[in-house]
Amino acid sequence: MNADMKWLDDPEVFRVNQLDAHSDHCYYIDYADMEKSENPLMQSLNGQWEFAFSKNVMDRPENFYEENFDASSFAKIMVPGHIELAGYDKIRYINTMYPWEGKEYHRGAYSMESTGDEAGMFSEAEYNPVGSYIKRFDLSEQMREKKICICFEGVEEAMYLWLNGQFVGYAEDSFTPSEFDLTPFIREKGNVLAVQVHKMSTAAFLEDQDFFRFFGIFRNVTLKAVPEVHLEDVWLQPTLNKDNVSGRVSVKIKVTAPEGRKVAAHFVLKDRENNQVAEDNITLEEKDGSRVGVIDTEVGSVKAWDNHCPYLYHAYVELRSEDGEILEIIPYDIGFRRLEMIDKVIYLNGKRLVITGVNRHEWSAKTGRSISMDEMTADIDCMIRNNINAVRTCHYPDQIPWYYLCDKAGIYVMAETNMESHGTFQKLGAIEPSCSVPCSIPQWREAVVDRARSNFETFKNHTAILFWSLGNESYAGDDIEAMNTYFKEKQDGRFVHYESSFYDRNYEETISDVESRMYAKPYEVEEYLNNNPKKPYILCEYMHDMGNSMGGLGTYMKLIDKYEMYHGGFIWDFIDQALLVKDEVTGKEVLRYGGDFDDKPSDYEFSGNGIVFADRKEKPAMQEVRYYYGLYR
């Protein structure tokens, strides 16, 4: 198969040769390797890559992936990182408009009778920048003679991949991992990996989030050596029983192994002090070319997990040979909790759930959405310090470590799928859905369901996730309904959230378990709750913290005591989106917001809505948050 630039124009092509999404577990050959700082089965490709920038598809170095290609004219670029912050293209912040507004007329393929398939919209566009990356590497000794996969944790927005001159695959969805099998093309030494990243494709219609419009390889790139016997996927479902003192855990695994090879699977659960509290053998059966196993194990005495006491247990799945030799170990920390809705009120472990939350973009003043572990840890510490107990991952899945940090800290998560098509149905503030995407357009359905699938499969084991969110501000329709159906069929005990059913009440019963609103005034919340409400109420965005804001927070907080069905909400938002740059006059570093980069179209200072500045210093508004949220601590 050869790469086809026309895939950029086709909403029905969003992944080619990409491996199926699976749980975000780590795996090790034995317990000794598990204690090492670096996993010998992993090899990072982060660092310096060769790079060339082109203004569009026609100007790209077409054969740059060939092994004998002369890349002497290529520059150097650091991965992970945004291409714009390396000095290429234009830094641009936009809220709801698309980058082409006012310059080119685009409507989503099949969104209107007159549009058709929109062939050439992006593949032949005068402006659609391309980044061509080359990475040369040798396999580490521990990785050799094994199946090798590569994982791109985040590439914005569409990527083509080659290895040693051979086409490997294509992927969209900027914010979930894209994995490919490199085994047919890889060698021990002298590998040439080539990645071509396109700033816009049909995925652009689904990624109209309120943020700076960057592109490039902005998250980690890792080679993974896959053992001959390998746990491909694990789904751990711990549940706190009704008595609040005992629990059970369901374990579902998918294992790959050579035909005829006998493999045993064993589950072990230990507490914080490393005392074993449960164990069970997992019987494996052949299914669709893999081996699958399921157990449901009772645990006699457990400590419940919640925001006040985020107690985690150490779970292990061991794969062993016929004679008992350990072949692979998968560790995962899990917590026991019970989430339920009784009489339209949500309860966690038998207590009414109160959300004192915040929306959080991933952001660094120096590196944009390519953030560090230290910055993530600082955000968790800030939330705990200021009585914030929940986070909405607006409006895309975050880096994998963020979910582990939330598990450990007891921060409740509304895990949002990477989808926002705001600019297709709201124009200059008016709701006008005549060309809304994805809506009920069949050609877009599988693309958005795949985004839901990637979100679920990757993060399904995280105790902190209480809600799956279908996305943000993408109107309503059969395609959104199909996403909801996907989550519901999983029956994982979590609730599904979506706000934009508010715009089309025909779908309010089929695309959200909660009544969700943005910026509804307190009296509007009361109007809903006083008039035969159908669902519990959550403000997925409120208290827009732009400028000297947050003064009315106390009025909203009073509703928590007044109405059982009101569960609180998520402040907009956690951190300003601004970049540290050197001032041309003073030479000092200053924070610059949307519009400060001569970017047009732009929504200017609207990028600054945080309760912390972009350098993570707390704003005065945080005093209000700490006080009022603290009343419900």
List PLM regions with ranges.
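Active-site-adjacent substrate/metal-binding segments within catalytic domains
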Residues: 81-139, 143-151, 157-162, 169, ...
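Substrate-binding clefts and catalytic carboxylate motifs of secreted carbohydrate-active enzymes
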Residues: 37-61, 78, 84-86, 128, ...
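Short glycine/proline/serine/threonine-rich loop/turn segments at secondary-structure transition edges
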Residues: 143-146, 186-190, 299-312
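Surface beta-strand/loop "capping" patches
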Residues: 228-259, 624-633
